[in-house]
Amino acid sequence: LVETKDFNIGSEGDIFLVDNAKLSGSNRLGNSFNIKANKINQIDNKLPIISGDKITGDINISSKIHIQIKAKIAEINTKSNVLKLFGGFQIINEKYKLIGKEIFFDFKKNTITSDQPLTFLFSKGEIQGGKLQIINSENKENDLLFLINDGVKIKYLL
């Protein structure tokens, strides 16, 4: 779903540009997102990939897990259900903050991955690493399982 007050379609009907857009979506697994973008348009004048800049929004990974996102640029592939945040991003939760260059939300597989360096900040310290995979934990009380590797550095306050 896209909401906007300013929608421009090319003369051939094959391109579009939306200013001050709100995008939202959900799937059968309970994932949902609400994103605000300064501008959105399709990539290479083809759907299903939509690009946006100056992104802010909320993502519900499950009924218990809610995060806020900020990014310079986002791409949403509506066919594969993948959201890519890049050009600098922040993911914020009441327990942690994740900062990096690029990250992928795969709503079909219910995973979050990054192959770029990132910093994971929490109340007692920080973890820096080169790769990240976040998956839903089998133990529902633990929320998410963070797998960080490739040059991990940990700072922890006792």
Region locations from a protein language model:
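Mature-chain termini and adjacent capping regions
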Residues: L1-L158
